[in-house]
UniProtKB/Swiss-Prot annotation:
One of its GO terms (molecular function) is fluoride channel activity. GO terms for biological process: cellular detoxification of fluoride. The chain crosses the membrane at residues 6-26, 34-54, 68-88, 98-118. Na(+) is not transported, but it plays an essential structural role and its presence is essential for fluoride channel function. Keywords: Cell inner membrane, Cell membrane, Ion channel, Ion transport, Membrane, Metal-binding, Sodium, Transmembrane, Transmembrane helix, Transport. It comes from the Bacteria. Fluoride-specific ion channel. Important for reducing fluoride concentration in the cell, thus reducing its toxicity. Na(+) binds at G76, T79. InterPro entries: FluC. The lineage of its organism: Bacteria, Pseudomonadati, Thermodesulfobacteriota, Desulfovibrionia, Desulfovibrionales. This is Fluoride-specific ion channel FluC. Pfam families: CRCB. It comes from Solidesulfovibrio magneticus (strain ATCC 700980 / DSM 13731 / RS-1) (Desulfovibrio magneticus).
Amino acid sequence: MLEKLGFIALAGAAGTLARYWLSGLVYDVLGRDFPWGTAVVNILGCFLFGLVWEAGAERMLLRTEARAVLLTGFMGAFTTFSTFIFESGGLLEDHRYLALLANLGFQTILGFAALFAGLALGRLI
């Protein structure tokens, strides 16, 4: 059990570093006028979660321990829902209502689309 927790923690550290790197890269490319970095990480995270879940759990291509490491460890640290809510709150406080609605709708709709794309791809594996 302790070994499993260690692997989950290491995967969590990797997920955190991947989130930091990718969101920073996106912000460098697209700017910081909109929470693009968080949006990209959340949408990609939804896709990867769907892919790992479908290919790993439903298709039995990953052992239970590997799924725990990937989904709980890496994906738990990689996705940034709390940051999404915090940044949305900032848009609300700044009275940027159109940007707030765009952010909420954009990430929610594309997040669902990415999840189902990942599930579909996982079914093909």
